Design a protein with these regions (language model features):
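Short, well-ordered beta-strand elements
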Residues: 25-34, 53-58, 81-82, 129, ...
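Extracytoplasmic "Venus flytrap"/periplasmic binding protein-like
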Residues: 46-117, 121-123, 129, 149-151, ...
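Conserved C-terminal helix/tail region of periplasmic/extracytoplasmic solute-binding proteins
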Residues: 49-50, 54, 148, 372-437
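Hinge/lid segment of periplasmic solute-binding proteins
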Residues: 86-137, 162-164, 179, 191-194, ...
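Periplasmic solute-binding protein
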Residues: 90-98, 117-155, 183-209, 297-306, ...
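Short, solvent-exposed loop/beta-turn-alpha elements that line the ligand-binding surface or hinge
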Residues: 100-114, 184-187, 202-222, 271-276, ...
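Glycine-centered hinge/linker elements that transmit conformational signals in sensory
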Residues: 166-169, 210-241, 282-286
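C-terminal lobe and pocket-closing loops
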Residues: 264-277, 289-399
Length: 437
């Protein structure tokens, strides 16, 4: 309770928003239906009570959220006062003037405590356009009990060839036990988040140095062929409907021997209140193939204020509250230390309670800090971004490619047909946008 009062007082005083100094307002927040955000929604009732302000929550599935907030910000619709956006959108939208700067939350916010690579990725021309709520890389989670029973040992750095061997040995569909769970739901931030890293590991790239698409190149063909075979033979039925949340549920309920996905999942699958296998799991690095470059992604979910908001001061008060050092401690005390938002503040990793509760903490931190968006694969590229390409056109391009690959996974077309369709469309898009001369 002391932490709660301190955090509320700090966020209100720093922005002149203590009850009685400003009229109470209603604000609308659009966010994703991930576990960390559900906790934020739950705890925000205390912020409402203390400040008198009210929150209208719009909590959406990941693909739907992206569509809604992108449409709203591009059309200046003004539906939202706070948006949950990724490390892809923040610098692009900030540069467009679509977001309000958020580098004025007060000295006590301690901007220096934010992890530098994450803060830098949200900054354009010296202005911060979003504050990180949690950050993630990707890694391989696996069932150590199943590995032990099968006489298998997971190496510190697995290859995709080894992952395929393990998946074959650990699949028992009669028990609904699948060797591997991977994202199959189409979307630039769903199946393509994972596939971007897999293609990188196979030595592939989105574009050559002249911005010509490389989607029908041999590395892409090999990576996607292996993905379709791996998930088709050893994954759950209906994998094309499974994104992050669906696979997290499958893993936490004991249906996946391995799961390659976001490091942020660790806080839930290691929590015995949310996971049936919390004491049976371990983790290691994401698999590699031809190279380790770009084999683990880099992603942040962030809170930002659209430039159209008429309630920016109240919105900033909430941002300060929800992304502060004291909020991290409040989550630890109320929800368990394993559940605190990862990857945003240096101080989180110095907390003895977090170090004790989260055996994955140091591994996750190093994965986040070591991701290099400027060198995402074996060969040179004209873009930055590990699992995405940091250009405005990528949202549409990535989703189209994801849809083609999802259709191949469903058996509706061959991998070659999917990649040829993707190559043709993306080449057309990049020519129209002026990248290809």
């Amino acid at each position: 309770m002391r932490i709660l009062l301190r955090i509320l007082s700090s966020s209100a005083v720093g922005l002149g928003l203590l009850t009685g100094l400003a009229q109470a307002e209603d604000i609308s927040i659009a966010t994703v239906n991930n576990g960390d955000m559900i906790i934020m929604q739950k705890l925000s009732a205390a912020w409402e009570k203390e400040t008198g302000n009210k929150i209208n929550w719009i909590v959406l599935e990941e693909n739907v959220l992206r569509e809604r907030v992108t449409t709203d910000i591009a059309t200046k619709g003004g539906q939202f006062d706070i948006m949950t956006i990724g490390g892809y959108e923040a610098p692009i939208w900030g540069k467009q003037g679509w977001l309000a700067p958020v580098d004025d939350l007060g000295d006590d916010y301690d901007y220096a405590d934010l992890l530098e690579p994450i803060k830098a990725g949200l900054t354009v021309d010296g202005k911060l356009y979003a504050v990180p709520f949690y950050t993630e890389s990707s890694f391989t989670l696996y069932r150590k009990d199943l590995f032990d029973a099968a006489g298998l040992t997971m190496p510190d750095q697995p290859t995709y060839e080894q992952i395929k061997e393990y998946a074959a040995k650990l699949t028992d569909k009669s028990k609904q036990q699948y060797g591997i769970c991977l994202r199959g739901k189409p979307g630039w931030g769903e199946n393509m988040a994972f596939l971007g890293t897999m293609v990188n590991a196979y030595g592939g790239r989105w574009f050559d140095m002249d911005w010509k698409p490389q989607l029908n190149s041999e590395p892409w063909k090999k990576a996607i062929t292996d993905y379709v075979a791996l998930l088709g033979e050893y994954g759950p039925q209906g994998a094309t409907a499974n994104g992050f949340n669906e696979n997290q549920t499958l893993f936490a309920t004991g249906h996946c021997a391995m799961w390659i996905d976001a490091t942020s999942a660790a806080g839930r699958v290691y929590d015995p209140k949310q996971s049936q296998v919390a004491d049976k799991i371990a983790f290691t690095r994401s698999p590699i193939a031809e190279t380790a470059n770009g084999s683990s992604w880099s992603w942040s979910w962030n809170l930002a204020i659209p430039a159209t908001s008429q309630k920016a001061d109240v919105a900033k008060s909430f941002l300060k509250w929800a992304t502060s050092k004291d909020y991290v401690k409040m989550v630890g005390e109320s929800e368990g230390w394993v559940a605190v938002p990862p990857g945003t503040r240096k101080s989180t990793y110095a907390l003895p309670e977090y170090q004790k509760a989260a055996p994955f903490a140091e591994t996750v931190l190093q994965a986040i800090l070591s991701a290099d968006p400027s060198k995402p694969t074996k060969d040179p590229v004209p873009y930055t971004g590990v699992q995405f390409v940091a250009i405005p056109e990528f949202q549409a391009i990535g989703t189209f490619v994801g849809q083609q690959i999802s259709a191949a996974l469903a058996g509706q077309q061959t991998v070659d047909a999917a990649l040829e369709a993707a190559q043709t469309q993306v080449e057309r898009d990049m020519t129209r946008a002026g990248y290809i001369k």
